[in-house]
Amino acid sequence: MPIIKSAKKRVRITEKRTAYNREWKEKIKQAIKEFEKVVEEGNVEEAEAKLREASKILDKSAGKGIIHKNKAARKKSQLTRQFNKIA
């Protein structure tokens, strides 16, 4: 347990940031799962919409520093390849 005031503040900030990052990472996972489910069903129009949604979430999270920009680009590339297989 921190004693110094600044250390206590750092603990509070870390807890807030951890919760915020966890929330965004959960959004990413959810968007990817929804996309993969639609791809598995073979619905092209809905898959395209889910791909756009997932790409948007990945770009936003990379911009906010939650994931690295290269990881976001790699994930988007993987999802696009999956989409192109059914399109």
UniProtKB/Swiss-Prot annotation:
SUPFAM superfamilies: Ribosomal protein S20. InterPro entries: Ribosomal_bS20 (IPR002583), Ribosomal_bS20_sf (IPR036510). The keyword Ribosomal protein applies. Keywords: Ribonucleoprotein, Ribosomal protein, RNA-binding, rRNA-binding. It comes from the Bacteria. GO terms for molecular function: small ribosomal subunit rRNA binding; structural constituent of ribosome. GO terms for biological process: translation. GO terms for cellular component: cytosol; small ribosomal subunit. Belongs to the bacterial ribosomal protein bS20 family. Binds directly to 16S ribosomal RNA. This is Small ribosomal subunit protein bS20. The gene is rpsT.
